Amino acid sequence: MRSILILLLVLCTGLLSAQNRVSVSGYVRDSSSGESIQNASIQLDSGSVSAESNAYGYYSISVPSGQVNLAFNAPGMETKYFVLNLKRDSVVDVYLAPAPRSVGTAVIRGKKGENVRSVDISSQTISSQTIKQIPAFLGEADVIKSVQLLPGVSNVGEGSTGFNVRGGGIDQNLVLMDEAPVFNSAHLFGFFSIFNPDAVKDVQLVKGGIPANYGGRLSSTLDVRMKDGNNQKFQANGGIGTIFSRATIEGPLVKNKASFLVAGRRSYIDVLAKPFLSDDLKGSQFYFYDFTGKMNYRSGRNNFYISTYVGDDAFNAQNAFGVKWGNTTATARWNHVFNKKLFSNFTYYYSRYRYNIGFSSRDAKFTWQSYIINNSAKADFNWFATPKHEIQFGGQSTYYIFKPGVAVATNSTGTNDFSLPDKYGVENAVYVAEEFNPSGRFSYRVGLRVSQFLYMGKGNAYYYKNPAEPGDRRDLESVKKYGSGEVISNYINPEPRFGFKYQTGTQSSIKGGYNRMVQNLHLISNTAASVPFDVWQPTTNNIKPEKADQYTIGFFKNFGANDDFESSIETYYKDMQNQVDYVDGANLLLNEYLEGDLLTGKGRAYGIEFYLRKTTGAFTGWISYTWSKSERIVKGINDDKWYPNRFDRPHNLYVVLNYKLSEKFSVAGNFVLSSGTPTTFYSGQYTVQGYTVPDAGSNARNNVRNPLYHRLDLSVTYTAKKRKRWESSWVFSCYNVYDRKNPFSIYFDTDYQNTGVNAAIRYSVIGNFVPALSYNFKWN
């Protein structure tokens, strides 16, 4: 009886406490453009309660009834204070004004001290302003090149697409554009990304402690949010560069309610090169373009968004040879506020990646096309349950169509079809996560994602014999035909997530995290740098889902008079299962029996990341250093011993600095120093019928490392005096300032001056100093 009375007393106390609290909710927006502000901070004057806006600028905070003081702030914006007398739940939409230019601007977007207070670990957000400050190839600001300067991130060199995170392949990064995935984020074989920086709002990279709402890749999520469009006034901006130009127009359709944005880029390499081409190459083309469009509309508790992207790269050598590749995405989203504490987002997206290759002569022609298409619907919910609890939950279903090869050869005698059969899959997922802050010092996030992948007909399932020796090609044993919609294989995987934060002081904290990730899409490539026509394969009855368990812990510390310096040191260990590799001599192109050439093994990656940045003032930037190892072990390869991944770089040092000399001039520089990537060299050679054949010996893999990679880039920006509604600037940049000939690859060829002797040939993609000049403008 006594226990029941105590329980009733506790419940009554909780109810009385709840009755003395009210909710304040709404959106945080930029007053100059109407753009929503993600991760804005909302703080009660007592400091006992705080909240932040979500990806769509929505917030909800529970406060005591009566008079309260609330402060709203975000980087680069002026803090706004409210004195509210609250008797019931209230809606307060907040518009923050941009801070004056004289005030220091954050390099990487983040609230003061949020890196210490937040439970997030291994996560960085970069604003579009930061991206534009970093010196880049040919003076063009670039999203992916900026991401590659963050700790734990690397790539295999110039001319390579994508990026590598904590020992993962480029296919193990989920790259999202307004929530739609893109499968090749590069233009011009990796020199530029597909993201127009003028249309980008901000970019978030999550490497560890990955929340449960993200899934489908092992290593990271790169979430690129595009601008919604200015709903206050019309404006245009763009630039004229060395090899391409860009333009963006945005403005209100209905002021304060609806807006639009359109942005486009087009290179003119083919136009510039035409006068220097011989007559037989005058018709050649080499260009890329992209188009981004977006509209949004607000109505009461509802926000509607439609966005699209279309982009292509094309190379055509006088119609004798041609290759073309590109992405297309379309996204429709509906935000709905059910009540003050329940926010929802419903999304449908379409994404397609395709490439075409063609050869032709006077009497013959060959074409090859490949596609990966997915349609997806998902629902995400934020429930602001109590001042200390936030619960996220949702689900997603995605339908995939894989067209690995539509190949046709035509000549004077007829037509031959070498096309491969299509493949189909359905990926489903549900998730729930809770973030709990029981005290000011300690908070945690726990979540569970459950994913399912169905490999489906219409199509054939291939079954192979076990090889006589590990590492040998598997011979086909039988084929079974499945009808449309029939399930060939079904995989269900739980994916637990956990993260915590313990604040050791007002300016320091310890954080940790664990996440299991599952991946059902596999990029099959035998090159260190992915090429546009690599093969994407789904999980099948032969290819199992890739899995990774990652453990991360780190110490975060801010210091300086105004917390101007933020620092962190993190260490991680990642264990990977079902990593896909291939037998020696595998045929990866137009091979219907490709799965017989594939092997699976284990992987491991571990390392330490150090990060120091200065966020405000005339002098800003960051320094990061990463020591890491990424290895695999596959039976039948390298004598069944661990060997380095193709993208393993043990040491990576990045220095990014920006100094504002005056209102008109600023200088910036970045320095990169990295270990060389591994490659496979043969240990001997033998002669067959007069031909010299290399012998790797003991099926070695990645047994030699390329030389050190290092590079310095500099830029100077001159900002002209503003004229009414017109702003402009000139950017002079220098890529690879001291003319370093960094090796992209090393191969062997015959030295004709010493007959019969093979010599190592060092190949550099960019082996020279590259200057550039670009002009940027803005009208508003």
Walk through the language-model features, giving the residues of each.
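Signature of Gram-negative outer-membrane beta-barrel scaffolds
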Residues: 397-507, 637
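Outer membrane beta-barrel strand-and-loop segments of large Gram-negative receptors
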Residues: 374-378, 419, 427-429, 538-544, ...
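Periplasmic N-terminal accessory/gating domains of Gram-negative outer-membrane beta-barrel systems
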Residues: 76-78, 109, 114-173, 177-210, ...
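Gram-negative outer-membrane beta-barrel transporters
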Residues: 572-575, 594-683, 776
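C-terminal beta-signal and adjacent terminal beta-strands/loops
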Residues: 287, 664, 673-692, 709-713, ...
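Surface-exposed extracellular loop regions of Gram-negative outer-membrane beta-barrel proteins
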Residues: 354, 401-412, 454-477, 502-550, ...
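Short, acidic, small-residue-rich periplasmic hinge/interaction motif at the N-terminus
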Residues: 27-29, 33, 41-45, 73-77, ...
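Transmembrane beta-barrel wall of Gram-negative outer-membrane proteins
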Residues: 241-268, 279-314, 322-350, 385-389
